[in-house]
Amino acid sequence: MSASKHIICEYSSEDPSKDFEVHNPATGAVIAIVRAGDATTLDKAVQVAHKAFLEWKKVPLTRRSQLMFKCAEEVEKHAEELAELLTTENGKLLSDGRMVDVNFVSQVYRYFGSLIDKLPGEFHDSGSVYRYVTREPHGVCGGILPFNWPPIHTAGKSAPCIAMGNTIIIKPGEQAPLTSMRIVDILNTVLPKGVVQYVPGVGPEVPQALTAHPLVKMVSITGSTTAGKAVVMAASALVKPTVLELGGKNALVVFPDADLHRAARDALEGAFFNKGEACTATSRLLIHNDIYDAFIEKYAAAVCKLQAGNGLKKGTHVGPCVTQAQKERVLDFIRIGEEEGATIAAQGRLPDDAEEKDGFFVAPTLFTNVKHSMRIAQEEIFGPVVTACKFDSEEEAVSIINGARWGLTCAIYSGNQELALRMCRQVDVGMTFINNYFRNTLGIPFGGVKETGYGREHCIDTLKDWSTSKVIQMPSGLAPVPSWPPVNELLPWQ
């Protein structure tokens, strides 16, 4: 990737009309102009990736592991650079980018590098034959990324992919592509050419070309439900496997016997960490009617203290939305909430620095008097907005949670362990939390159900998504292999 402001990378189009701007969301200033790829340059990338795959799949597991550990070391050398770049193009807090996003890259490369030779195989002895089940790589794969966690998604897709012997082409989120591109450049100082590549793009052109390419054998996307469905439709034409992580409308449920202070703390983090631009954001608070007023009083006071601002500055709690369009989307939902009859019970503070007057800021917002049928309680807003609804019983809470289109997470706060465990089994989500909302999921399955998608990331089962099973069978020599009776009659053993 060029260090100049105008970035033309290896697989950029020759067409200058493919240029697109990347902004600093804290100031609105253009920080880079990137030349997107197109179907032609995507094909070139696929051809390079396919050639690399034919050699990479033969690299011994121990060597593959060594290279992945080396990748982790190289990324760590650039940790501060990556964190600052991430905040500059995405808007998240520098401390969060450093502690969470960038650290995850090295962690996930070491994790999957250490698992390469530990994926359990299967051996079946049926008496007359031995059957061994092993895993084979798909080939060239595609990884389509969103804008909210560029390092996490770049590593979360590329690490298990190449660990299993595949090669991958990354399509970064167009709103914040620079960090993903830089990470791939760093990885390529270690890996053979073509193992991990990126093709930038705007809109559906590059993802469609990637998904429909006959040499691309598997695609994983993290993004909107609309984008995910488009990938599934294109992949189905070639009967191509996909992995989908498409968002959530997650609930944090508080019962009367809960520790209200703990619940309020976790609800504050769940709603406003990463400025609410997280598929795991707990944007729906379900508060039992008996404690609703007490909880809201405590929670609203904290929301009012939240300071929106530049993620590079100390004292900032909530960064800007990633783009002006995302800001307008969130503000539209705030207007919709008021029109639907909900009440803005609390809002955080907007920045007053002149440098940030053109930034994409939205005041952190808490809605009360929310009915479960309202759009703000049903749709994924993807911004610093949280709704607080009342419920009266466990059954009602379960019904509200399961009424959402998505099913990613649910957090339950109660002193009654039996109730909490029972609810965990009843809610239609992929991940549940009892009296905590700690979302570092490396090592356990990350993913959901319903319109959240399918497949699991960040765990040993992820390696199965990035590979396919193969059966190897041979006679055991211990007993005759069964055969069709007419064969014994027409071609008897000599």
From Swiss-Prot:
It is an enzyme of class 1 (oxidoreductase). The keyword Kinase does not apply. SUPFAM superfamilies: ALDH-like (SSF53720). Transmembrane segments: none annotated. The keyword NAD applies. NAD(+) binds at residues 223-228. The active site is at residues 245, 279. This is Aldehyde dehydrogenase.
